[in-house]
């Protein structure tokens, strides 16, 4: 992933005569967006232009010179669920010097906090580093997991374009930003293993629907099971 660079002139005189030395300072840039890296290598790995098994997704909306908001729809994630999170891997700036405002759109909130990342799936060389962690919150049905006929829950308005801005904690100046477009929202049923018909009825009662194969990324087309973990789905058209 290429990054932009700042060139500053150093006006110090040297013995050979008057000369300005160029000091190349990397500008703050988001290099990768890291979800859970389990099942992200070998036969599960994505295209090299999109995915690094040790770092996560490459940012698609940035080139050598600038950020392109019109390409936010190519960035990760495009789907979300309550309490899911991912990390922004940023270079060229002290993460602890950044502050982020939460963004709420269509009933979904993206909140960024600076955390020390020690998740078990993070490579050893990256553990303990401070990262900007993005958590999504929105409609969920935790208090109705055990109810076979739950009450309807809120439906987010999709799609929504989120732009997260990291600002200097002292000056409030914009330092770095990241954008993505959420097109789908999932609601899960925890550890409840039920038949397809039971899960279908549960989802429909919520006002959602069961996802189809084409709604899921990387899903095999030939799974066979008598009982399923509940996961309901709403797409950008609100379709059921």
Task: Please give the residue ranges for each predicted region.
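Extracellular/periplasmic catalytic domains that process cell-envelope and extracellular macromolecules
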Residues: 125-127, 172-177
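A Trp-anchored, charged/polar loop motif used as the substrate-binding/catalytic surface
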Residues: 152-170
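Long, charge-dense tracts
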Residues: 48-93
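Non-catalytic protein-protein interaction scaffold segments in large eukaryotic complex-forming proteins
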Residues: 2-58
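Residues that flank catalytic or metal-binding motifs in active/ligand-binding sites
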Residues: 19, 84, 130, 158, ...
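Conserved hydrophobic ligand-interaction patch in extracellular adhesion modules
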Residues: 180-240
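An exposed tryptophan-centered "aromatic clamp" motif
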Residues: 75-79, 84-101, 215-240
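Extended acidic/polar, glycine-enriched regions
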Residues: 120-156
